[in-house]
């Protein structure tokens, strides 16, 4: 058993093949030329080479690259945020057009310094993508916007195809993992989103390996279903730097398969679970048939 000073050894199934082909290089160049940020880079996502080089997909991160929070699992920079860039929505939309994306995920740093939490720019990004890419489905992944539900309404009024907000971990560990958020506020955020737009699927994600129990994971599933969440992703927590929380346990792929089966039995319409699964990993495959049909009617 590992001591507090030791790291739990990373298993072989978490080894990643790096791929820096023309797609990868081209996408990186496109992001830099348009002064855009991706959570793929900023959060040190383990799937960046697969998504960029093979699938040619990316998750755009708007509202700058500096977060006002300092969650202990996240590699995104924290500190004083940058000024709002109202040209950013159009640049994102144009990049989506150039990439010819069928599904796009837009996330953002937390902007607790803004009265609307960045909702206006977020909503305009959705509308800009829709104008230039009418057949692209759009998934948004906002922070809890400080629990100000008028801000959530601004975003939901833009009619994204999926509203994704992550609880990240189980109830007991939330104060330690993300001190400036609360478990209950995230659940309420998801519930309010469904109340505002009942036909828009909602989605959330749980990291495992932080010291939670199986029973706590199942309790989190029940809490999400009680708040009408449709889609769930479950992935392995990986420590981005030595300053972040250490991994307590690496889950075996068979354990992820079991969690997926439990989630589906709870009534989630879709569950993606695996060691390298992240909230936006294979997000294009998670779009419900209802969301696709609604988009085609637009």
Curated annotation (Swiss-Prot):
It comes from the Bacteria. Residues 53-269 form the Radical SAM core domain. Pathway: Protein modification; protein lipoylation via endogenous pathway; protein N(6)-(lipoyl)lysine from octanoyl-[acyl-carrier-protein]. [4Fe-4S] cluster 1 binds at residues 40, 45, 51, 280. Keywords: 4Fe-4S, Cytoplasm, Iron, Iron-sulfur, Metal-binding, S-adenosyl-L-methionine, Transferase. GO terms for cellular component: cytoplasm. It is found in: Cytoplasm. Its cofactor is [4Fe-4S] cluster. Its EC number is 2.8.1.8. Binds 2 [4Fe-4S] clusters per subunit. One cluster is coordinated with 3 cysteines and an exchangeable S-adenosyl-L-methionine. It is an enzyme of class 2 (transferase). InterPro entries: Aldolase_TIM (IPR013785), Elp3/MiaA/NifB-like_rSAM (IPR006638), LIAS_N (IPR031691), Lipoyl_synth (IPR003698), rSAM (IPR007197). GO terms for molecular function: 4 iron, 4 sulfur cluster binding; lipoate synthase activity; metal ion binding. [4Fe-4S] cluster 2 binds at residues 67, 71, 74. Coiled coil: none annotated. Its main location: cytoplasm. It holds the Pfam family LIAS_N. It catalyses: [[Fe-S] cluster scaffold protein carrying a second [4Fe-4S](2+) cluster] + N(6)-octanoyl-L-lysyl-[protein] + 2 oxidized [2Fe-2S]-[ferredoxin] + 2 S-adenosyl-L-methionine + 4 H(+) = [[Fe-S] cluster scaffold protein] + N(6)-[(R)-dihydrolipoyl]-L-lysyl-[protein] + 4 Fe(3+) + 2 hydrogen sulfide + 2 5'-deoxyadenosine + 2 L-methionine + 2 reduced [2Fe-2S]-[ferredoxin]. Belongs to the radical SAM superfamily. Lipoyl synthase family. This is Lipoyl synthase. The gene is lipA.
């Amino acid at each position: 058993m590992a001591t507090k000073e030791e790291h739990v050894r990373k298993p072989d199934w978490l080894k990643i093949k790096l791929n820096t082909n023309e797609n990868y290089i081209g996408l990186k160049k496109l992001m830099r030329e348009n002064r855009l940020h991706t959570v793929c880079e900023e959060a040190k996502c383990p799937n960046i080479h697969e998504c960029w080089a093979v699938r040619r997909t990316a998750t755009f991160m708007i509202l700058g690259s500096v977060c006002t929070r300092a969650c202990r699992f996240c590699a995104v920079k924290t500190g004083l945020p940058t000024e709002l860039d109202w040209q950013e929505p159009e640049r994102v939309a144009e990049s989506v057009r150039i990439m010819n994306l069928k599904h796009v995920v837009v996330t953002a740093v937390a902007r607790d310094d803004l009265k609307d939490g960045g909702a206006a720019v977020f909503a305009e990004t959705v509308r800009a993508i829709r104008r230039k890419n009418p057949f692209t489905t759009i998934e948004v992944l906002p922070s809890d916007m400080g629990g100000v539900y008028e801000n959530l309404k601004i975003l939901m009024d833009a009619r994204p195809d999926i509203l994704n907000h992550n609880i990240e971990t189980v109830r007991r560990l939330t104060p330690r993992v993300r001190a400036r958020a609360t478990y209950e506020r995230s659940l309420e955020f998801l519930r309010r989103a469904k109340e505002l737009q009942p036909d828009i699927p909602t989605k959330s994600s749980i990291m495992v390996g932080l010291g939670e129990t199986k029973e706590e994971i199942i309790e989190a599933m029940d809490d999400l279903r009680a708040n009408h969440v449709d889609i769930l992703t479950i992935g392995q927590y990986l420590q981005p730097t030595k300053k972040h929380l250490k991994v307590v346990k690496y889950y075996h792929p068979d354990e992820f398969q079991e969690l997926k089966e439990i989630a589906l039995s709870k009534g989630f319409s879709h569950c993606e679970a695996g060691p390298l699964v992240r909230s936006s990993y294979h997000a294009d495959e998670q779009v419900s048939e209802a969301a696709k049909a609604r988009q085609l009617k637009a």
